[in-house]
């Protein structure tokens, strides 16, 4: 009987653990999740953006408590074929090709294509260093994608924020 119960226990343990995915767990504080595509091209030839998405963190410069602002924007064509910007809060405004050209200028100025394929995030860092990401699709079929921890000293998040703030301000 003891052998039978041991066998049943072993089978049940195997069945339950078969569905367990250790990679789905949240990484421990200081743990690094690295899904970097080291073969991703570091040069994007196209300049014609067809879709754009970004998410980043910035320190609120007006707050005495060093509050963190989370910025999230998506740019794509809407159902009518016009370019639409959607902010993280769901607010949407129409834009034009000039906005896409401005975004591409920031990508070029800060050489963000060099980050293409980077997908590496360290868990448990202070909020200011939380993940930032960018995904850009081009008419040529090329794609720029990266995700990594924020770096407060970098200028591209502020440049992107300013472009989007101006776009929303013009449409109000």
Predicted features and spans:
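Bacterial N-terminal signal peptides
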Residues: 8-16
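Short, solvent-exposed coil/turn segments at beta-strand boundaries
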Residues: 73-81, 140
């Amino acid at each position: 009987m003891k052998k039978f119960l041991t066998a049943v226990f072993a089978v049940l343990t195997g069945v339950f653990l078969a569905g367990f995915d250790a990679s789905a767990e949240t990484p421990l504080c200081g743990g690094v999740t690295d899904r970097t595509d080291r073969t991703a091209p570091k040069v994007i030839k196209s300049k014609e953006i067809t879709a754009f998405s970004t998410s980043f963190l910035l320190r609120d410069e007006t707050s005495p408590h060093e509050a963190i602002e989370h910025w999230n924007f998506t740019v794509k064509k809407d159902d009518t074929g016009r370019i639409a910007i959607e902010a993280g809060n769901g607010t949407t405004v129409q834009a034009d090709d000039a906005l896409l050209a401005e975004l591409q200028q920031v990508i070029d100025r800060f050489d963000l294509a060099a980050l293409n394929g980077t997908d590496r995030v360290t868990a448990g860092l202070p909020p200011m260093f939380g993940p930032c990401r960018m995904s850009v699709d081009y008419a040529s079929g090329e794609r720029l994608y990266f995700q990594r921890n924020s770096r407060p000293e970098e200028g591209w998040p502020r440049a992107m924020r300013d472009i989007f703030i101006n776009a929303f301000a013009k449409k109000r």
